[in-house]
Amino acid sequence: MVHATSQSASTEKNVKPCIETDTEEVNHKNQTKQYLSESESGDEYDEDLENAVSECSYQTATTSSVADTDISNICDQLLVLSTTNHKSMGSTRGKKKRGKTAKKAKKANRAQKITEEEIEAIKKKKKLDADKAYELRQEQMKIRQEKIDASDRNKIYRRLAQTAVDMLRKEERKLPPEIKQLDEDLEYYVENSKFYLRINLRDRYLETRVDEISEKYIGPALEHKTELLKIYEDLIKRSLQAFRLFMFLKTLNEKSVDYTKFEVLTLSFVMKGFEDDWLEVNGTYEENESYLSFEKNILHDIPETDQHVNAAEFVMNKLIYYAKKDDDGTLNLKECHMKEAYTGAGQLIAEYKQCTNAIAFLQDNRENLAYNLMEEWFLVSRKPSPIVL
């Protein structure tokens, strides 16, 4: 009985290590499979792992009394192989696998084919554009040639007009028949038209003619025409300002100091033709404010025809007054200068009316066949002359 008990105890002692060995074997196999599944290295590492597993299985199957040291050795071998495998994986990880590069497929030509109708349409459009460009060049050349021709003709008209003006200055009354007829037509026109209508025609001419001659003439002819029109514009502007000043002067007391001072300023403007701000620069603040108030509250309701009549009457009365004193021999030096200044003012008013009549006649005869000669003659012969005292 004692022998049996000792034998069973010995058997139990031998079986227990074997069970533990089997459990450890299963755990190691599972670890090995996990390493194999994570690995993406070459076949040589897989073979080493398989050999190690086979060897471990063989040793476990043949003997059930393998010591713990043998199992430890096997685990050490597996650990070494696993470490080597991971290092190899780290060195190859992140690198692209080399392989045969596939040839890129050629892109299909997706351009739409142009039909014959579209080609013909493109050709027609190009031809049409070329024809338009050619016509534009021809039109520009035609316009330029017309400007040259008009400028050349203007030279002839200008020479004829200047010759006639020189004849008038020399008091030779035998003018060319064409020029004489133009003067007669102007006289007839003035006698049979209203002055306010002539003012409207004059303004329309000055507003439009500057742009028209820029399109019609070129070179010296253009400069000549532009200069003449500017002289007429300045004369009209200066005359209208003088009319307003004379009307304001008429409202003041002739025996006051303000009247005397403003009269000198007005005549200075007539003689020298100051700019628009002449009164602000040369007059006092009170004079400037008084005139501006008069211009704003009274003058804006008075038409140009009435302003012209009032200014003309005022200047005429002054000339009659100084002429009478001159005849009596009581005209002093200061009054003599005032008489000369009012004589210049009378000249300005006369030229204003003369220029208005001539320009209105030109505007009313724009369709006349002899218009170019007519315009050159009247602009030259009626050109304002400087006021000489």
From Swiss-Prot:
Residues 40-49 have a biased composition (Acidic residues). It comes from the Eukaryota. Residues 1-49, 86-111 are annotated as: Disordered. Residues 1-12 have a biased composition (Polar residues). Residues 93-110 have a biased composition (Basic residues). This is Uncharacterized protein C03F11.4. It comes from Caenorhabditis elegans.
